[in-house]
Design a protein with these regions (language model features):
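Ribosome-associated RNA-binding proteins
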Residues: 1-167
């Protein structure tokens, strides 16, 4: 049986917001409104301390939601906010990221007085079949370079499926 391992697809979309204290709570509310799911808390490492920024070990510094279902629908809503245009420098191997300055630009979302004006980051991660070789615990292997997704392949995929323009 021959399998086409060159076929790529979107693995997940990650929405994240940074902040501390009251700002973080507003970010939690915003992500819950956008996705309908409970956000996870991002913490600093147990040994990390940055006094200049007021960061202490195990401090909550952000919120994140990972979306694996209804990806095309959500991604189209997010791309509308940036006019379906991405820069090539926003691309990386196997993923790309972009920022949304104000959540009220997302279609279907209205201004929330208790949240105020906030932005968020969107990361889109791609994958190919055969990735489980690297992720499994027993008999783990390495993924060859041909399985990694290049910037050019991501650009082609986004232009075909989402009519995205690249600068």
């Amino acid at each position: 049986m021959i399998k086409n391992n060159k076929k790529m697809k979107i693995e997940k979309v990650v929405l994240s917001i940074g902040g501390m204290g009251d700002s973080l709570e507003k970010g939690f509310k915003l992500l819950k409104i956008l996705t309908g799911r409970k956000p996870a808390k991002m913490k600093t490492s147990p040994n990390r301390r940055i006094p200049a920024l007021g960061v202490k070990p195990n401090m909550e510094v952000g919120a994140v939601v990972t979306i694996r279902k209804n990806i095309p629908e959500i991604l189209k809503r997010m791309l509308v906010t940036i006019d379906n245009t991405l820069k090539k420098k926003q691309m990386s191997e196997n993923n790309f990221s972009f920022g949304i300055e104000e959540y009220i630009e997302i279609p279907g979302i209205e201004y929330q007085r208790d949240i105020g004006i906030r932005g968020l980051d969107v990361t889109v991660v791609f994958k190919r079949d055969g990735r489980r070789v690297r992720l499994k615990k027993i008999k783990r292997g390495k993924i060859p370079a041909r399985q990694k997704i290049s910037k050019e392949e991501i650009i082609k995929f986004m232009e075909e499926n989402f009519q995205t323009k690249f600068i």
